[in-house]
């Protein structure tokens, strides 16, 4: 974007940024993300606060959001090149990490910002810098949570500046195409493995039902899971 902006008038750049950030913000809101701040043409987004759908669903929402952002930019290419005189196609890169961070009001005694801080944020920022144009790059922490929903390229190791250790990361290829039979199999496997499902198991089960249910019964099942998370599941004979 920096190289492109040098070839375009400042007023047109301002108009483009307003257009672009509006488009990306709408997608963020659609998938339940919290916009922390705009940094030039970049957006910092986090999940898990002020509301969370659980680790698995939050991570999945974030990757779904990233994919839709990429798809939206691709669809807007003809309009962008015509409306804003861009000499080349615009591509965005996205870095995603999962980890603990501090969220709250930080700043001086005269001015506070609601923001997230911590090493997990820094790693996500570095992954964005390491990503290729048009790539969604996720850390291993994120991949572990969402690998049932997406396909990834082979593992690669990066050494992000400012991070004291190498980071294993993966490029998101696309969303897995799961048929109804495989979804039922995954849900059944969760149920029969242990009647005392963990929170992560419940998150995974809810995510599967919510996304892939093809009739109203799926919605009812999902609602039932939300209302009775601690109820044991019996295996009828």
Report each predicted region and the residues it spans.
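Intrinsically disordered, glycine/charged-rich C-terminal tails and inter-domain linkers
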Residues: 91, 132-237
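Catalytic core regions of nucleotide second-messenger enzymes
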Residues: 31-32, 36-39, 70-95, 157-158, ...
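Catalytic NTP-binding/metal-coordinating core of nucleotidyl cyclase/transferase enzymes
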Residues: 1-64
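Cytosolic nucleotide-binding catalytic cores of signal-transduction proteins
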Residues: 23, 42-45, 69, 73, ...
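Catalytic/regulatory signature loops of cyclic-dinucleotide turnover enzymes
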Residues: 97-98, 106, 119-140
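Flexible glycine-/small-residue-rich
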Residues: 47-49, 98, 105, 125, ...
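A short glycine-enriched loop-to-beta-strand structural element that forms part of the catalytic core
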Residues: 46, 87-104
């Amino acid at each position: 974007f920096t190289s492109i902006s040098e070839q375009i008038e400042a007023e047109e750049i301002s108009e483009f940024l307003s257009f672009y950030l509006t488009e990306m913000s709408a997608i963020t809101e659609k998938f339940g993300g919290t916009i922390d701040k705009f940094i030039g043409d970049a957006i910092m987004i986090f999940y898990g606060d002020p509301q969370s759908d659980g680790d698995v669903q939050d991570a999945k929402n974030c990757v779904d959001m990233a994919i839709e952002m990429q798809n939206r930019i691709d669809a807007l290419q003809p309009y962008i090149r015509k409306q804003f005189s861009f000499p080349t196609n615009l591509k965005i890169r996205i870095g995603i990490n999962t980890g603990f961070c501090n969220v709250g009001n930080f700043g001086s005694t005269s001015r506070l910002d609601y923001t997230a801080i911590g090493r997990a944020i820094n790693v996500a920022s570095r992954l964005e810098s390491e990503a290729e144009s048009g790539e969604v790059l996720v850390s291993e922490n994120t991949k572990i949570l969402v690998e049932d929903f997406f396909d990834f390229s082979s593992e690669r190791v990066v050494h992000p500046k400012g991070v004291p250790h190498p980071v294993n990361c993966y490029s998101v290829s696309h969303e897995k195409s799961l048929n109804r039979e495989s979804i039922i199999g995954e849900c059944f496997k969760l149920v029969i493995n242990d009647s005392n499902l963990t929170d992560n198991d419940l998150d995974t089960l809810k995510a599967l039902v919510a996304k892939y249910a093809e009739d109203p019964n799926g919605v009812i099942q999902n609602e039932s899971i939300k209302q009775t998370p601690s109820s044991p599941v019996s295996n009828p004979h």
